[in-house]
Amino acid sequence: MHIDQRHYDKEPTSKGEKIFIIVISLIFLIMMTMEIITNFEPKKLGALLFIVFWIPLLFIHEFGHALMAKILGWRVQRIVIGFGKILTHTSLLSAPMEIRSIPLEGFVQIAPKTLQLARLKHALIYFAGPGIELLVFFGIMILLGGMDNLFTINNDYTHIALQSFAYAALAGAVLNLIPLGIITKGGSTPNDGMGILICLFSTGMDYELWIREAEKESRF
C-alpha cells in the first residue's frame, strides 16, 4: 500500500463499462423520479439533492487536500476529478487539473519537499478533504440556526437544499475517515482514514525516497 495520495490512474472505462453505468443510472433516475412525482411534496427532493450534491462536494473535497498541501509547503503535482476519459484540462492553485467523464471520485497527487514534520503534514493533508466537508456541515448547521433546525423536515425549498448539502457533506466525511484500502489495478491505495494511519506509522526513509522520486519526475 502506497503512502502517497492516489498516485495512480484508473484505466479509461471500456465501452461495456460505460453502457452499464449509463443503464444503471437511467434506471435509478427513472425510479427516483416516479417516487418523487407520486403524491409530490417538496421534501421528497431531499434524496435526489443528496446524490446531486456529491459532485460539487467532490471538487470541494479535493480542493481541501490541495489547499492544505499548498499551505504546508508540499508540491501539488496534479488534481484529478473523476475517472475515465479526460474531458478538459484546467488548473487549480497553480497545479494542473483534469476533469474526467465520471465524477464519482478524485485524487490529488502530492509530494513533500523536505522531511520536516513530513508524517504530521501528510496526515493533515489526508484529513483536509473530509475536514473541509465537516466545515461545510457545521457551517450549514450554524446558518440554519442549530442542530434542531438542521434535522427538522419541512417543505421549504431552500431549507431542503441546505439540509441535503449538509447531509451529503457529513456522509462523505465519515465514509472517507473510515480506514479502508481501495483495490485498484495498480495495487492497493489508502482512502483518507487509512492514509492518516499509514503516514503516522511510516518511516523517514519512506518520505526520503518519495522526495527523491518527486525530484526526478520534476526534471522531465
Give the location of each predicted region:
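Low-complexity, intrinsically disordered extramembrane tails and loops of integral membrane proteins
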Residues: 1-11, 211-220
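Alpha-helical bilayer-embedded segments of polytopic membrane proteins, i.e.
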Residues: 10-31, 55, 124-143
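Hydrophobic transmembrane alpha-helical segments that form the core helix bundle
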Residues: 115-215
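Topogenic membrane-insertion module of multi-pass membrane proteins
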Residues: 2-46, 101
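Helix-boundary and loop/linker segments of multi-pass membrane transporters
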Residues: 38-43, 111-117, 157-158
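Alpha-helical transmembrane segments of multi-pass membrane proteins
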Residues: 31, 54-58, 168-176
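Membrane-interface elements of multi-pass transporters and channels
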Residues: 40, 67-75, 79, 83, ...
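Small-residue-rich helix-interface/hinge motifs
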Residues: 48-116
